[in-house]
């Protein structure tokens, strides 16, 4: 018995030592395509092996994480998205980003206790399942090469029949204390030198691929981490480099940030990178407040029964989003409307053309959500404050909200009263 205990202890110590040997990432950047830089001095066989990217995370750790997530999911039911009262601007921004992730994410600023986190988690629970390559740590798409990891693409080129499974859209939380190597991933240099393979432990960006990456209190996150997140969200790729070894993987996700303006604002150059910006406030109507309290109490008493009451509405909204994704490809903003959108951006002195691009995308997504392919002025009117309010130059003496200022210019350009 003592001998067995000593052997088990030495195995655990060896495993722990193997994990500690993973060198934190010093630098990371986003690349538009995957590339590999084999280390010098390695034998030919090792260099060939270096072309394979393997997840270095221990099997038992992954299994433990999977069990923990499942148990938490069962112990903490999600409040239904369709049961959320008010906050229509935030819900619209989230739905449009789900329909067209190229909008570029959404920043949600509002008071404490206004349902920001609840709404975002409810959205992830609402979305349909997706097809992934089985046992792939990057959630690779079995049919789209742009959403495949390098290893999966090599398997496809070799003619291998990929095993496919279904899973829920991943919802990844990024804690404020996360380090850069936890976000981007870690390369095990020791394993690369001794075994001739590039052992890569995926980070949060890999787990969030094809899903939602949520950062609560994003205005308190380190600026360099915000840069990494925004770069990855914009290009769809994450590249980790260390000691001449380079590993890239797809990192396409919907970036959702939330924060309280009382705790500080994001730098304008970072705020501009978010596609949309929603502002929410505390509900003032006493009747709505009573309804919110009543619904929350009912949900806390019997979550399963409460979710059952909203099941039909949830399924209908899910199908509506699926249909909108298909219809989006046929959507079109006519030339006259595009000129007027750009005129509004010019009149508001919006820097760059991100505002023009995002407004056009959001208007098409809203039209698709409403079951149409043609964008109307009403579609543009509903989305343009979300797309432009955070891109305006701040005037400390201004007496009008930025969203209202956008609406005023819209009415002037479109000739609406």
From Swiss-Prot:
EC number(s) per entry: 6.6.1.1
Pathway: Porphyrin-containing compound metabolism; chlorophyll biosynthesis
Span of chain positions assigned to the transit peptide in the UniProt entry: 1-54
Localisation per UniProt entry: Plastid, Chloroplast
Binding-site list for ATP: 110-117
Cysteine pairings via disulfide bonds: 345-387
SMART domains for the chain: AAA (SM00382)
Gene3D superfamilies registered for this protein in UniProt: Magnesium chelatase subunit I, C-Terminal domain, P-loop containing nucleotide triphosphate hydrolases
Keywords: ATP-binding, Chlorophyll biosynthesis, Chloroplast, Disulfide bond, Ligase, Nucleotide-binding, Photosynthesis, Plastid, Transit peptide
InterPro entries xrefs: AAA+_ATPase (IPR003593), CHLI-like (IPR045006), ChlI/MoxR_AAA_lid (IPR041628), Mg_chelatase_ATPase-isu (IPR011775), Mg_chelatse_chII-like_cat_dom (IPR000523), P-loop_NTPase (IPR027417)
Catalyzed reaction equations: protoporphyrin IX + Mg(2+) + ATP + H2O = Mg-protoporphyrin IX + ADP + phosphate + 3 H(+)
One GO molecular-function entry: ATP binding
SUPFAM superfamilies: P-loop containing nucleoside triphosphate hydrolases
Domain of life: Eukaryota
Keyword Ligase among UniProt keywords: yes
Entry GO CC: chloroplast
One BP annotation, GO: chlorophyll biosynthetic process
Regulation of its function: Redox regulation; active in reducing conditions, inactive in oxidizing conditions. Thioredoxins f and m mediate the reversible reductive activation of oxidized CHLI.
Family: Belongs to the Mg-chelatase subunits D/I family.
Subunit structure: The magnesium chelatase complex is a heterotrimer consisting of subunits CHLI, CHLD and CHLH.
Task of the protein: Involved in chlorophyll biosynthesis. Catalyzes the insertion of magnesium ion into protoporphyrin IX to yield Mg-protoporphyrin IX. The magnesium-chelatase is a complex of three subunits, CHLI, CHLD and CHLH. The reaction takes place in two steps, with an ATP-dependent activation followed by an ATP-dependent chelation step.
Protein name: Magnesium-chelatase subunit ChlI, chloroplastic
Species annotation: Chlamydomonas reinhardtii (Chlamydomonas smithii)
């Amino acid at each position: 018995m003592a001998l067995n205990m000593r052997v088990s202890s030495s195995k655990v110590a060896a495993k722990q030592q193997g994990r500690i040997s993973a060198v934190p990432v010093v630098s990371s950047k986003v690349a538009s395509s995957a590339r590999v830089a084999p280390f010098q001095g390695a034998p030919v066989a090792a260099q060939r092996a270096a072309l394979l990217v393997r997840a270095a995370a221990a099997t038992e750790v992954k299994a433990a994480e999977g069990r923990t997530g499942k148990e938490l999911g069962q112990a903490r039911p999600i409040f239904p998205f369709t049961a959320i009262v008010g906050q229509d601007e935030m819900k619209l921004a989230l739905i449009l980003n789900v329909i067209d992730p190229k909008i570029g994410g959404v920043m949600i600023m509002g008071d404490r206790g206004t349902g920001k986190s609840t709404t975002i988690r409810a959205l992830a629970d609402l979305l349909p399942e997706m097809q992934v390559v089985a046992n792939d740590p990057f959630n690779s798409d079995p049919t789209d090469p742009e959403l495949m990891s390098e290893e999966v693409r090599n398997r496809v080129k070799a003619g291998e029949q990929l095993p496919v499974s279904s899973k829920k859209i991943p919802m990844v939380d990024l804690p404020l204390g996360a380090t850069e190597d936890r976000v981007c991933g870690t390369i095990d240099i020791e394993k690369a030198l001794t075994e001739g393979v590039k052992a890569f432990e995926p980070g949060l960006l890999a787990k969030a691929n094809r899903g939602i990456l949520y950062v609560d209190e994003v205005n308190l996150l380190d600026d360099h981490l915000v840069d990494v997140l925004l770069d990855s969200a914009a290009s769809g790729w994450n590249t980790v480099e260390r000691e001449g070894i380079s590993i890239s993987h797809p990192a396409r996700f919907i970036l959702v940030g939330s924060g309280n303006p009382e705790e500080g604002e994001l730098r304008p150059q970072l705020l501009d990178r978010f596609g949309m910006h929603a502002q929410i406030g505390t509900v003032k109507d006493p009747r709505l407040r009573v309804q919110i309290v009543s619904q929350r109490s009912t949900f806390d008493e019997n979550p399963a029964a409460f979710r059952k009451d909203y099941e039909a509405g949830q399924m209908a909204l899910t199908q509506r989003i699926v249909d909108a994704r298909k219809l989006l490809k046929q959507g079109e903003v006519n030339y006259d409307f595009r000129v007027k959108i750009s005129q509004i951006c010019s009149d508001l002195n919006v820097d760059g053309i991100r505002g023009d691009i995002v407004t056009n995308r959001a208007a098409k997504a809203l039209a698709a959500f409403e079951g149409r392919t043609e964008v109307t002025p009403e579609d543009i009117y509903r989305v343009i404050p979300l797309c432009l309010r955070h891109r305006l130059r701040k005037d400390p003496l201004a007496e009008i909200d930025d969203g209202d200022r956008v609406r005023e210019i819209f009415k002037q350009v479109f000739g609406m009263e």
